[in-house]
Amino acid sequence: MTLQARNLTLARGGAPILTDVSLTLAPGTLVGLLGANGAGKSTLLAALAGELAPRSGQVYLGDADLATLNARQLARRRAVLPQKPSLSFDLGVSDVVGMGAYPFPELDPAAVRQLVRDALEQASVTHLAQRRYPQLSGGEQQRVQFARVLAQCHAMHAPGQTRYLMLDEPISNLDPRHQMELLATARALAHEAGMGVLVIVHDINQAARWCDTLALLADGRLAALGPPADVLTPDHMRRVYGIEADVLAHPTLPGRLLVLAR
């Protein structure tokens, strides 16, 4: 069962944000969404998550139009990590991660506690479990929010039912080690747990290293879509980012690329 955007067009205040964009997120794949600032990446992610209604076009989860699903139905099938999660309450870290279980009221407290423990461990933030969320650094908060969406994805996972995870710039506040850990976890969720994962990143080389498929947006349109070798070309770098770049085979990772701006 795929999550599929078909010919999406979306505008805000009369200004076009997306124009005729189609994209499929399939189980078992990690898709990277790239593009310059203002290209429409976050808008496309929000539309795929069912949070924004397109002016034309549809988003389908299998055969179901996303517009026909209510908020709880959506939350039980997909989890979203926004670019800037807002949380104004003085909650403990475990309470924040436990919010991932909110769409699943049938879970008993013991099951929720285990879900939280597992998510904290998978996100490598177990050592923060007793801290207060507002007292954390920006990077620590980002990792705790990642644990929250992991809990949401793993809750009440029925065999054969695909879950989708959407991450909007999840590594923007992270140091290099934690960037790699988060993206490695995202890829494992796709390849080993069979999830469909969409991630927005600005680091082209991180996208080249971890993603199976890349979608390159330019001015609200899909400029390129495919494996990294097809998308990360000097011509695309010039047209989309306005930079001259060399694209080389990665010296230590077979089948992966390095993009070096001149």
From Swiss-Prot:
Listed PROSITE patterns: ABC_TRANSPORTER_1 (PS00211), ABC_TRANSPORTER_2 (PS50893), HMUV (PS51261)
Which branch of life, at top level? Answer: Bacteria
Q: Which Pfam families match?
A: ABC_tran
Please report the name of this protein according to its UniProt entry: Hemin import ATP-binding protein HmuV
Q: How does it sit in the membrane?
A: Peripheral membrane protein
- Subunit comment: The complex is composed of two ATP-binding proteins (HmuV), two transmembrane proteins (HmuU) and a solute-binding protein (HmuT).
The ABC transporter domain covers 3-244
Alphabetic keyword roster: ATP-binding, Cell inner membrane, Cell membrane, Membrane, Nucleotide-binding, Translocase, Transport
What this chain does, per the entry, is described as: Part of the ABC transporter complex HmuTUV involved in hemin import. Responsible for energy coupling to the transport system.
The UniProt family comment states:
Belongs to the ABC transporter superfamily. Heme (hemin) importer (TC 3.A.1.14.5) family.
Q: Which organism is it from?
A: Bordetella parapertussis (strain 12822 / ATCC BAA-587 / NCTC 13253)
The molecular function GO annotations come to: ATP binding; ATP hydrolysis activity
A GO cellular component annotation here is: plasma membrane
